[in-house]
Each structure stands twice: as structure tokens, then as C-alpha cells.
Amino acid sequence: MAVQETDLDKQLLQLSIQVADLAARTDSRGSQKIQDFLIKTQQSLESPWETLMRYYDLDFQHVAIRIGCDMQVFTTLTTADKPMKLQDIANVNGASERLLGRVLRYLASINTIEEVGKDTFEANHITRTLSKPGIEGGIRLSSACQRPTNSALPDLLVERGFQDITSATETAFNKAWASREPFFTWVRSQPKIFEYLRLALDVQFREDWLNAFPLESHLGDFASRADPEKVLFVDVGGNLGIQCRGLKAKFPHLSGRIILEDLQETIDVALALEGVETLAQDYLTEQKVKGAKFYYYRNIFHDNPDDRCRLILDALKPAMEESSLLLIDDKVLLNQGSHRHVTMLDLAMMAQVASHERTRAQWQALLEGAGWKIEDIFQYSHEYDSIIVVKPAAQNA
């Protein structure tokens, strides 16, 4: 029997249409503001019991999504050309219909799939997102590695008398895994987790730094130099080369070599990119490419505590010429009111690698303490992703 539509249902539908229309007329920053407003409004309506249940649910959502990945729910529904019956999904993944039905009903209740009829389901936009290899890699990485680390963090902070974590071998990760190695050393001995990490890192951010950073205006006389060996761009620790590919696409007319650097095992699996050279390079060792115009480090510094960041900077400095620029692509936090996505990442980096997301003052202290100077900062996303333009301090004297 159909449920009769109430006046409240009609008003909520109109409100939903208004919100969707408002979101369609704004940019990503405005969209995030709308989402934050709706979340805050929802939380303001909660009873104490509903607040408790929300926190219970937050933890279990992650568990259920991981189960959905294991059961191939998201890829199965995404590739289907029509809604699927429970039995048909079970035929794909071999799950018992009773268990599968319980999982699917929960996934539908948290809007990761659509329940369109009795024991009938189809994909929505979140389903399609979760079916992407990089997104699934991030889910699996978080489930396999970050969740145990997060669980160990409260007890570790109690043991430390609530002092900041500053050693990469004394983190919540080390406590959870009973390891004395830094995370990025340990993870290379864990093939599955390392593959999840590689997939997650390959996910392109929604915003493109090249739209905000005026690269051509920072070239100086580089474009007019006739040297065929001159190097335009070195992507240090660049994983599979997404940024090199983006640079080539946006500035096909620029001359100069483009070089992708990472550890040998990453370079070995990177697909060949036309016009992009590859080079095995550990960013903690002296930079092999000398005199490039741009040395680009994306999310490298936020992976490392300050002492290791100083080693990274020291390894680069001998390669810099007077016209060279270091581009640090990382977050520059607000002193007040930073978004929860970024403050979450800050705690996650502390728990995993004893690092942190940095404010402008913290970036300045780190760089000036290592003999460098910030020339400019270009923010390119509403989550404070920024290009920090840096030169050795001696070049600014």
C-alpha cells in the first residue's frame, strides 16, 4: 500500500529543490558551505540519543562500505544497466541472500546505494564514486591500516601525558602494529597495503593547482633560453605522474624537459607519458636534476615531521640555481575555523607519521629555520590546498 504524501513531505521536497538549485549556481567553495550548513542544521535537531547513535553509525559506515567493496556491490551495481534483484547480486559475489540483504539494506539506509523496491537495488552517484579504483583503494587503505592506528591513538596519548607526537617511530601506528619502523618504511614491506596507498594517491583532487598558480609569469627568462637540455619541471615524489600529465596538457607550448621522480618501485609501475621522463630518486637524498626551473613537491612535506622536512630541503638546495623555484603543494591552515576535513587529516598525520598540517606561521618557521624564504602563497581550493613558492634565503639577500 502506497504511503500518503503529507504536507511535511511536500515542504521537504520544495526545500530539497531549493538547496539543489542553490548548489547548481555556486562553485565548490559554495557547495562545501551548503553541505556544512546542512550538517550543522541536522546536528542541531538531534536528541542526545540521536547524537549517540550518529557516532555509533559513523564508525559502522566505514565497516559496511569495506564489506560492500569486498562483496563487489558498488562495481556490480555501477555496471548494471537496470536495477538488480538481491538474487542477481548474490549470483555475482556468491554471498548468501540473507547476509547480502542485511548488508544492502544498511548500505541503502546510508545512501551509498538506492533501494528502489523489495529486494531491488540500483546505483546512485555515491555508488559510482565508491566503484572507482582509487576511491576503493582509499577505503581499503583506511580499513586495513588507518583504523587500527586510530584505535591506538587515545591510549598512546594517555601514556604520553597528552604531549604531541614528534617521532616517526613512536606513533599510534607503531603502537598498533608493534613496529619500530616509520610508516613509509614499513608499508613497502606490505604489498597489499602499499598497493592500496598507491591507488589512493592516484586520485586527482577536485581543484587543479595550475588554474590558480600563474606558472608562466614565474618563468622569467626560461622560455627564451636555447639550451635543449633545460629542465622546466621536476615532480619530486610524483607517484604515477598525474601532475606531469596535467602540466603537459595545460602548457603544451612550453619548452623544457619534464621529469617525474619517485622511488624505483613506483617508477617501475608508472605508465609511460609522452614527453615525460622518469627518474628514480629518493627525496631524502641529494637531488640528481640540477638547475630546473620548478621543483614541485605535492603532499610530501605533510607526510613528514619537521626534522625530516629539513632533510628534504637540504637534499634539494644544492640543485637550485638562482632562477630555480621550489613549489610546495600542501595545505596552509587557517589560525581559526579550519574545515573538519583538514583538521581530521592533521590528527591522522600525527597518528600515522608524527607529522601535521601546518598554518602559515608554521610553514614560515619551518622554511626560514632551514634557510629558505617564502616568496608567495597561492591558495587553490576551499580546503586550503596551496602552492607555496620558495627560494633559498641566500637568493633573496
From Swiss-Prot:
Question: What domain of life does the UniProt record list for this protein's source?
Answer: Eukaryota
E.C. number, please?
Answer: 2.1.1.-
Catalytic center at which residues? 302
Sorted UniProt keywords: Methyltransferase, S-adenosyl-L-methionine, Transferase
Can the keyword Magnesium be found in this entry's annotation?
A: no
The GO annotation for biological process reads: methylation; secondary metabolite biosynthetic process
The cofactor named in the record is: S-adenosyl-L-methionine
Family matches, as Pfam families: Dimerisation, Methyltransf_2
- Identify the residues that bind S-adenosyl-L-methionine: 262
Coiled coil (residue ranges): none
Which sequence ranges are marked TM in the entry?
Answer: none
Named in its record, the pathway it takes part in is: Mycotoxin biosynthesis
One of the entry's Gene Ontology molecular-function terms is: O-methyltransferase activity
Q: Member of which family?
A: Belongs to the class I-like SAM-binding methyltransferase superfamily. Cation-independent O-methyltransferase family.
Biological function: 16-O-methyltransferase; part of the gene cluster that mediates the biosynthesis of the diterpene glucoside brassicicene C. In the first step of the brassicicene C biosynthesis, the bifunctional diterpene synthase bsc8 that possesses both prenyl transferase and terpene cyclase activity, converts isopentenyl diphosphate and dimethylallyl diphosphate into geranylgeranyl diphosphate (GGDP) that is further converted into fusicocca-2,10(14)-diene, the first precursor for brassicicene C.
Per its record, how is this protein called by name?
A: 16-O-methyltransferase bsc6
Q: Which organism is it from?
A: Alternaria brassicicola
- Read off the lineage from the record: Eukaryota, Fungi, Dikarya, Ascomycota, Pezizomycotina
Task: Identify the coding gene.
Answer: bsc6
